[in-house]
Structures are given as structure tokens and as C-alpha cells.
Amino acid sequence: GLSFDVLLKRIFRQDPDIIMIGEIRDAKTAELAVRAALTGHLVFSTLHTDNAVESVMRLEDLGVPPYLISAVLRGVISQRLIRRVCTECGGAGCEACAHTGGKGRIAVAEIFPIDDSFAEAVYTHASPRELYRQRKQKGLPSMYEDACAKMRQGIITPQEIARVLG
């Protein structure tokens, strides 16, 4: 039969340089993505996690051993979309924003490039707390910190941060 993993295997045979997998939902897809990355393909995909560090934990939950995660993972971007403050009325509500105070959305994100020290931490099965500590030590802002910076610029509201990031 024609399944997702069969289609992925067929794509791999075409020897593309870059492969985009819409979402890694199960162990089989995770295994195929890792195998593709190990053979020199640049693989992009999505995972349902709350932040960048949890993406590593999710791959482990899907059965990818830490030594393989550390070998193939090059970076993680985690994002959420938050409603922007309407630029016409400053959030008070007007016809341009249908009296909601917000118009459009903007991403709040955390970007986590994987360097040697982080790969080593993953390889040695470091705790999530240690991975968060490394992120902070490198000066990489969390998604919450990115949201707060956008709030200070007047782009989003504290209420939206609370609604989306909890």
C-alpha cells in the first residue's frame, strides 16, 4: 500500500539535497528523517512541542536515541503566533480592527542553533533543566522573553502573552 513512510522512501531514492517532512508524528517518520539526515540530506520538519528544548525530548519519546539526535540536529526554532496590537487605534478598537484592538499576528519565537556543547549535552542525555541552562548561558532568548520584548515595543499586549503562552 501507499503510506507516508513508503512515499518518504521513494523521495529518498531521488537523492534530493533538501527534504521537508510536514510533521514528525510517529517513530517510523522520526526514524526516516534521522536516516535521511545521516546520509547527508538537509531535513526540515515540525514537531508539536511547547518550546525548542522540548523538541529534543519529543524525538527521544519517539524512540530516537540521544546519540543520533546529537549527530543530526542542527537547530530548532519554536514559535507561536500572537495577535498584534492594531496600529490604527493602538488597541482601543476601531473599524480597521473590527473593534477588537488587534489586527494581524506576529511570531514570538526561540531559536536554538545546536553547537558542539549542546550536542554533547544531548549525547550524554542531559536533563531538560541542563539544556535550558545552556540556552540561557548562550544568551539565547526564550519564547517568553521574545514575547516580552515585543510587548515592551507595543506590538503585543500582556493579555495576549498570557493567552497564548499561558
Q: For each predicted feature, which ranges?
A:
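Short, flexible helix-loop junctions that flank or precede catalytic/ligand sites
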Residues: G1-G166
